[in-house]
Amino acid sequence: MSDRVYLRAIDIDRYLPHRRPMRMVSEVLDYADQQVRCRCRIEADNPLLEDGSFPARGGLELLAQTSGLLLGLTQQDAEQRVAGIVQVKSFRLQAVHVPVAADCIVQARLLAGNLDAAQFEGEAYYNEQEFFAGTLMLAQLLKETT
């Protein structure tokens, strides 16, 4: 599915609980068969900034948000619940200067799992240079009962 009109219609707010300034996923560029590619914007008020730049380890949050979006997209008919990182299986960092107002491209692929818990792998790029790659597991949190 690479129809840009359809992709722009994806309501990211429906799938991610994050709001500005923490939500960095700004656009879905491509989505097909258990993988997604997103644009992520690094804003000046981003809480992860260090000395005016986005650290490579922040790629973990970019991958988590992109993976959470993918989890929601693959389960569109199910009730949406908040998910969190429960395990980081592996990661690789590269020293890359990612400035404020940068657009990063993040790819995520669903490796295994279901709506309750799933494993993803992916990469984050700035200017076509990979600065983060990793594998993580997300689990949806239990719905609070009263």
Where do the language-model regions lie?
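HotDog/MaoC-like acyl-thioester-processing domains
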Residues: 3, 69, 99-100, 105, ...
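Hydrophobic beta-strand-centered segment that forms part of the acyl-chain substrate-binding groove
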Residues: 5, 69-105
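Compact, glycine-rich, soluble single-domain proteins
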Residues: 51-70, 85-86
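Short aromatic-glycine motifs in intrinsically disordered, low-complexity regions
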Residues: 9-19, 80
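A residue-level detector for short acidic-glycine micro-motifs
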Residues: 27-30, 90, 95, 110-112, ...
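Catalytic strand-loop segment that frames the active site of acyl-thioester-processing enzymes
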Residues: 20-55
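Short coil-to-beta-strand transition motifs
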Residues: 17-24, 98-104
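Small-residue-enriched segments and motifs
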Residues: 23-26, 86, 91, 106-108, ...
